[in-house]
């Protein structure tokens, strides 16, 4: 069996694909797996690190601007798109793909369109409640549309294609043990705060986190704080933290990217993060109480919708970016850590939301689509 996964841009598209690929490899150890991504995306780091082969396409999404620069960019993107579809057809043929699985990101569209043109079985996983542009564009080509939330089904034209599977997360998010992970990371008995605002980072949130670390120093470092800065902030944030009188020490840990996220999240007592669907589901699988600060810079405000859905079930505290100060976050951290009853209720609510067998469900569907070619 030869399986192609196509994804890219951010960890939220890539990590679910890796989770499913790992389960597929466990079920079918003789399978060959190939990823198709975009030039310059996080997939260039994450996919090889996970042990899978990657081929990339010229990147770049469409601009929504009607300016000359926006139109010029879109002309280039459309040219690259046609070229990428043809390149994907060649990759699929040369690899002898039996199925193509997309989990979002620029590269998914040409790869899934190519699969459709070649009559190769394919499925698409949409992580958000409201489908994104790529998902809507590839629906006609895909055999199955896999969604996280039952209420999302109404957005799809062909209901016979839609199946609810939840969000695939790596098994480590489910099975890691807190104390073992804390020991592995060399952490002491103080509470652990994990903050991360996406694989690329977020300027306003990194600035807020730097100030939060200053408040933590002022308070005598009552907890340990691990922060994933992101690639865009790595050049300037460590310097900003130093200017506030804080340095990496036994309580402050700055990382450009947290590659061992399942371990770090399992060790954490509280997670502070954006509210992308992938992140929300990883937090739910790990059962770690969280403070969600949804990004206001996303299509259809989908992150706030994700965050509010968790908040309504008692599974998250939500602070909108416009109201997000370091002091507000510090106060919320203290509130969660001091009220153990509320903390435990949030932990339990998160575990109720999680779909721990989501990756298994996707593999079941992949086996159905390739019936006759797979062997259990």
Where are these predicted regions, by residue range?
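Conserved nucleotide-sugar phosphate-binding/catalytic loop shared by glycosyltransferases and other
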Residues: 2-10, 30-83, 231-233, 322
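Active-site-proximal region of nucleotide-activated glycan assembly enzymes
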Residues: 42, 53, 116-178
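Donor-nucleotide binding loops and adjacent catalytic segments primarily
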Residues: 46, 178-271, 304-307, 312, ...
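Structural loop-to-beta junction motif characteristic of Rossmann-like glycosyltransferase folds
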Residues: 52, 120-121, 269-270, 287-295, ...
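Glycosyltransferases and closely related glycan-assembly transferases
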Residues: 87-100, 108-123, 136-140
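Acidic donor-binding loop of glycosyltransferase active sites
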Residues: 97-99, 262, 266-280, 288-289
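A short, well-ordered alpha-helix in the C-terminal region of glycosyltransferases
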Residues: 342-356
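C-terminal alpha-helical cap of glycosyltransferases
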Residues: 355-376
